[in-house]
Each structure stands twice: as structure tokens, then as C-alpha cells.
């Protein structure tokens, strides 16, 4: 198939940027979703284009269903049909469950789980109608195993895994695959900015003895987006250096 458009939600963050680069290297026109009037947008686009990547911005608050629809419509009209969707948008609002504010529960579920519905709902039917598509949902090791102090985040990321399996069954005969990636600790700029002793303590829990590289997640996305991965669907691929082997 000829490469068309790949949409990456939360595409201008550390992990999102790596995913965008990996897909662009494979010849996709990559649309990086960001919030409307996102201050770093122009600088991010300029940097990516200077590095030779064919990237665009798709503005929408992914917690807003109507905004997602408008974004998808604009992308399809101005850039092309969306053949690959990577649902990567996510936030954290950590805290003990008994002390967790309802607003922090709602914010994480809305951004991390509802957004997957909001964007995918506008894209998946067209993929199925065309007989081709790739949906890649970014979950987390903590969605697989749970994590102390992250009841909201773990619930949202676990929800992504169930949604992935259900959608995969619905569209498997339509030439569309739906898979999830569950990263462990990845060396994004945000992680690398924490205190060295804290980072070292995290690394000590990982059998591989290191953090994952953002480009390792990006390259896995590129593989799942390819024709080579056409028989993989409904899968959760753990990429965590052996941190969790369930």
C-alpha cells in the first residue's frame, strides 16, 4: 500500500516526538496532535522539518469529542486519509486513592481513556470501509500490573487494553489491526530531568539495567503500522526491560 497519513495524539511530547520520527522515516505524512494554541507548536514543527521530517500539526483537545471530529475532518481534507492512528495522549495525577480528588480521577480517565474513544470513533469506520488501517494504543506497564499511588492512571491504561481487544475483534475481517503497546520506564526528557538518585533507584528495578529509549517505542509503532505486522491484532506488546513479565 502507498503510505498516507499517520496521526499521533499527544504527538509533541517526548514519547510522541519519537513515534512521529519513526513513522516519518517510513514515509508517512505524520500529523502530531496538540492542544489548540499550544505554545511550543511552531518551534516543534520547525525543528522537526529542519531535521527532514514530513510533519504537520493537528489541533484538538482530545478530551473533547467534537474537537476530535473537526480535527480528523480537517486532516482528511487538507493532508489525506488517515491509515495509521497512534493513541498516545496521556497525563498523570498521582496520589493515594483514599486521598484522590475526584477532579484528578476524571482528568486522567478523560485524557488517557476517553480520548482513545473520541479520536478512534471518527477514524476506525473509514479504515474498515477502505479495508486497511492500523490503530496502535499506548498503554503502560502500570496498566498491566497496577501501581501504588496510580489508581486513576492504572485504571485508564488497563481500560485501553480491554478496548484494544474488543476493537480488534470487530475489525479483524476488515483489514484493520488494533494493538496496544505497554511501555515501562522510558528515558524521555521528563524522566531524565528527575534527580539522578531517584532515576538510579528506578533503573535498579529493571532487569535490563537501563531505561528504555523513546525511539524503541517509536520503532515498535512503525513496525506495527507496517504490512509486516498484518497478522498481529488484539495484542499487548510489553516493552519494559523485563520489569514485568506477566
PLM ranges: what are they?
Residues 172, 177, 232-234, 240:
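Short, small/polar-rich loop/turn modules that mediate ligand/substrate recognition or access, typified
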Residues 120, 156, 164:
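Active-site helix of classical SDR
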Residues 12-13:
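Conserved glycine-rich cofactor-binding loop
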Residues 125, 169-173, 230:
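Alpha-helical segment proximal to the catalytic Tyr-Lys
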Residues 26-43:
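Conserved glycine-rich Rossmann-like NAD(P)H-binding loop of the short-chain dehydrogenase/reductase
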Residues 140:
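Residue(s) in the substrate-gating loop at a strand-loop-helix junction
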Residues 96-97, 101-109, 191, 202:
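Substrate-binding pocket helix/loop in short-chain dehydrogenase/reductase
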Amino acid at each position: 500500500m502507498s503510505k498516507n497519513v499517520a496521526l499521533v495524539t499527544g504527538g509533541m511530547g517526548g514519547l510522541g516526538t519519537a513515534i512521529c520520527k519513526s513513522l516519518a522515516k517510513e514515509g508517512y505524512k505524520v500529523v502530531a496532535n496538540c492542544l489548540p494554541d499550544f505554545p511550543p507548536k511552531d518551534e516543534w514543527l520547525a525543528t522537526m522539518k529542519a531535521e527532514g521530517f514530513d510533519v504537520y500539526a493537528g489541533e484538538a483537545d482530545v478530551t473533547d469529542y467534537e474537537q476530535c471530529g473537526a480535527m480528523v475532518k480537517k486532516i482528511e481534507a487538507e493532508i489525506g486519509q488517515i491509515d495509521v492512528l497512534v493513541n498516545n495522549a496521556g497525563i498523570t495525577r498521582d496520589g493515594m486513592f483514599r486521598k484522590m480528588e475526584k477532579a484528578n480521577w476524571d482528568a486522567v480517565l478523560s485524557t488517557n481513556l476517553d480520548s482513545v474513544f473520541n479520536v478512534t470513533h471518527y477514524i476506525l469506520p473509514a479504515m474498515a470501509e477502505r479495508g486497511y488501517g492500523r490503530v496502535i494504543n499506548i498503554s503502560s506497564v502500570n496498566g498491566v500490573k497496577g501501581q501504588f499511588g496510580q489508581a486513576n492512571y492504572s485504571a485508564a491504561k488497563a481500560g485501553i487494553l480491554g478496548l484494544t481487544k474488543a476493537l480488534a475483534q470487530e475489525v479483524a475481517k476488515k483489514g484493520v489491526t488494533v494493538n496496544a503497546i505497554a511501555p515501562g520506564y522510558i528515558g524521555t526528557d521528563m524522566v531524565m530531568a528527575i534527580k539522578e538518585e531517584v532515576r538510579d533507584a528506578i533503573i535498579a528495578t529493571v532487569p535490563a539495567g537501563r531505561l528504555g529509549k523513546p525511539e524503541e517505542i517509536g520503532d515498535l509503532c512503525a513496525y506495527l503500522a507496517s504490512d509486516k505486522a498484518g497478522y498481529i491484532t488484539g495484542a499487548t506488546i510489553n516493552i519494559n526491560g523485563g520489569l514485568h513479565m506477566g
